[in-house]
């Protein structure tokens, strides 16, 4: 561990800090715990880049850390040769406080290293950055965003030439390089305006939007159904103060939605997210303004995208007419089932269709895919793995991926992005809702019909939060305990197979035989139970918490719900 007191003093004495930054550090003088939490070591650069609260300090998100991280990334790009520097980087940012300043700081460092920069003139959805990297043939991409985290956070996500987030080997190369770089003296910089004049920085804007949106709109399968219900079909949309505010409504209107109602208060771009505690479409509480508007105008369907517009959540009216949240698992199943039918009806289904999901996403999606002649493949959590799998399958000529999704409200569609894309997903989910509306059904009705057809699947994710400096130790201890002393039964139901994605082992609990899985190299444990339930445990990659996923199935809705309750009670015992 770094001598945090010495590092704190070094920052205080540095000429690199301005008066406000020094005042912020002087204000915590004497607060040992706060000083330690800011200076105990540098932020760890992972495959998701960096994410943290915005404060002055080595272990925080600020302009100095952004420059330092960018210098490491620039060195890795430069190591690929002059052509890579010429291809350059695309840079994008979300609506958060400091996002624009951080993005410009990253551009200045890239330019000073002779790397060509294409930077968006203002905030854009994350999928548009992935598109820009691919469209302009860039070597890499940088996105300043903390996605759906609270307002105190910001982040730095990095992409490679395929438009996907960085593969582990490149992330490791950057992390290794950063160990050699002094945060103040080791970073090259060139003033933004000078770099523009020198032709090293160019601005991206409307032209890129048009190219991106032409790809998005080409994904439409069925305008006829939308036109059929256009006069009565009503949609409420909220961007939660973020990047979806322009392109999502444009996509829906382009689809033929006549009655689109946007939540005015949340169409205001604001990185403090004044109307919500959390700008996360996974949290139904944030939809209160959208529900009020939907009730006022008589809409049955609500869409909400997170601040960087890579994830989308929906709400629909339930059996009693009140709005209920449809989970990411359920939305994905609905969309997959719909797309298979819609693509076949439109003559757009490829010869060997594939569908990708993560290991923690509902098994109902596999059932839907395989029942309809679509091959299903699992990947680790994160769209970089799904992008990698899509690239590999298609390059080998094995088939074509029609959809990829994960349970946390992310969907990757089409061939023009390699990350989750709430713009395209919003378009196709709305097309689906209109198609069902033409049949006199809501998406709630549609979901019940799918349960009757494919089985009563149910899922629940628990977050075991472990904050503080000892949080990581507690997380490691829990994972170690589950490995060294694994449960023989869970909530009274026998564990039949125990899988460890770290080493790829699969243990048959009855015989003790050990088999090998296709996937390995990730800190995830999987317990498959005698009643068909699967429980997965993994540490979060971005926050101090252990995530526990319950994937179950019942003979009917009541049995499914009882299973979720039973296994949820067991999960709570893990931290006792």
Language-model features: locations:
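Short Gly/Thr/Asp-enriched flexible loops that form oxyanion-binding sites at enzyme active sites
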Residues: 102-110, 153-160, 310-329, 365
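Phosphate-binding and adjacent anionic-ligand microenvironments
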Residues: 295, 299-301, 322-324, 342-538, ...
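Glycine-rich phosphate-binding loop plus the immediately following alpha-helix
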Residues: 159-189, 329-352, 357-366, 422
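Gly/Ser/Thr-enriched, mixed-charge loops and adjacent short helices
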Residues: 34-43, 154-286, 292-294
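Conserved phosphate/anionic-ligand binding catalytic regions in large, soluble enzymes, centered on
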Residues: 39-59, 146-149, 239-251, 307, ...
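An N-terminal, well-structured beta->alpha segment
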Residues: 2-106, 195-235, 243
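N-terminal small/polar loop signature for handling phosphorylated ligands or for N-terminal nucleophile
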Residues: 90-153, 256-313
